[in-house]
Amino acid sequence: MGNTCVGPSISKNGFFQSVSTVLWKARQDGDDALPGANGAPDGGGQGRLPAPPPPTSDAPLAVQNKPPEHVKIVSTTDTASAEQDASKSSAGSDSGEAARPRPRVPPVKRVSSAGLLVGSVLKRKTESLKDKYSLGRKLGQGQFGTTYLCVERATGKEFACKSILKRKLVTDDDVEDVRREIQIMYHLAGHPNVISIRGAYEDAVAVHLVMELCAGGELFDRIVQKGHYTERKAAELARVIVGVVEVCHSMGVMHRDLKPENFLFADQTEEAALKTIDFGLSIFFRPGQVFTDVVGSPYYVAPEVLKKKYGQEADVWSAGVIIYILLCGVPPFWAENEQGIFEEVLHGRLDFQSEPWPSISEGAKDLVRRMLVRDPKKRLTAHEVLRHPWVQVGGLAPDKPLDSAVLSRMKQFSAMNKLKKMALRVIAENLSEDEIAGLKEMFKMIDTDNSGQITFEELKVGLKKVGANLQESEIYALMQAADVDNSGTIDYGEFIAATLHMNKIEREDHLFAAFQYFDKDGSGYITADELQLACEEFGLGDVQLEEMIREVDEDNDGRIDYNEFVAMMQKPTMGLPAKKSGGLQNSFSIGFREALRMS
């Protein structure tokens, strides 16, 4: 199962300025009373939760790392409940984005047997996974499952195993999505640039997909690592990417989530094949069939998808965006938040004037223009793209190096600044009871099953209670922004971090306490080793530590001091030049507070 049309890595810290003053004003008018812990309106009918008293300077920083009045739900597993994130996994799944938005007709139909009966998802009895494979270390984590290294007992050969917890498959659609993903992987099996599936297994706890192990790293990482990059190489990669799209379309499959994170190299060798992974959002289609559900990832989503009327042409648009990035290092349509990105996708102009475009061949620019035509009827098909002179073997793509700035931009674009989100989580977990009393009540109000985890459905209902009229894709984006560990749910600590008022984040004692959390040895600096340890504690594996440090390290000494740390917390989204001014107001927590109609 894949990502929804939600937060890109570099825009997660700036979100939804559009749901702001209007929502708060409506709350002031008292139209929607916010329920308290027992479901009744709080605050004497004013519709507000009790405001936390102002913090005192000597307030203890008691760690709040458990949900309030946590009631453990009986579960058949302690296995992690998130699907593989492509940027961290060697077999690949999506980048840590939330479950895909698709319209639901209330009430939601529950699949009561999915987490209890063997064969309830695959509809057949399978061999035991553990009889054939031994599971090793975790490779990656996403919304619905976790990917592990697994070794075939009979041969000792290594594979990747994506385990999807059945208790996460809440609706009939969720179950059908898993079945379809498996069917599509088998349907496309044998293509050299599509990840191969070894087998599917099911037990009472999870569905397990054993697939080819892709240990060669992500597309952009390999390019940056090599350091030498030419337009001809970009054309070669474009040929592979569009070739996969053509094969999918010829076999009646639309991928619907093409992005660089979903392309991994099979191994570390120079001649390693580039593989397409993660078919969680893919779907079978017939010629002329029209789809309406909004899925994908913001930078790569086609305009007709946002308009909820699209076909297979949307994949060509996504491939065109990837080629644009391969040539210049940044996406063609971007903004500081998801809403802005969607506006740019719908109405923005392609930039061929900024560097390095003046030095890029006219053939490359012609191809990109024709792939990024907003009218899908006028857009090139995948087959037509492969016939374009710039893409063809021995074609027009020159063998001259691209500007070195392309590599640095690409590296910035592909690396998430996870440090800031981890720091916000640390601050949230070190607030006193008084400081978060109101937020605790709000968490209890939304977490209706007292599981200690807010699901998408619970968040949707909670937002409706407070009068926030958001689209499903917007709610998924809020989930994405708050879900630091990519588990597909928002736990107590993540919720507090996402709803903190800026005056708490700016307090010196909170910033210093967060800095000390990362500065394990008390040296006054956060080193790469300390950052690696923190990432492991947060369940974030295979992150680009050097790039995370480089984004913050102003004096280029390879480590982060306290002043640099504070500056990071006060800056808007990193990675691309800011299109809008702003400081802490651009934090991802603002979008959550506004949606919940908080001050």
Swiss-Prot record:
Localization of this protein: Membrane
Tissue expression pattern: Expressed in roots.
Gene: CPK10
Lipid attachment locations (N-myristoyl glycine): G2
Name of the protein in its database record: Calcium-dependent protein kinase 10
GO biological process per UniProt: intracellular signal transduction
Region (Disordered): 27-110
Source organism phylogeny: Eukaryota, Viridiplantae, Streptophyta, Embryophyta, Tracheophyta
Residues engaged in binding Ca(2+) 2: D483, D485, S487, T489, E494
Record-annotated EF-hand domain positions: 434-469, 470-505, 506-541, 544-575
Domain annotation Protein kinase: ranges: 133-391
Similarity field: Belongs to the protein kinase superfamily. Ser/Thr protein kinase family. CDPK subfamily.
Residue ranges of the region described as Autoinhibitory domain: 397-427
Species of the source: Oryza sativa subsp. japonica (Rice)
Active site as annotated: D257 (proton acceptor)
Residues that coordinate or bind ATP: L139, G140, Q141, G142, Q143, F144, G145, T146, T147, K162
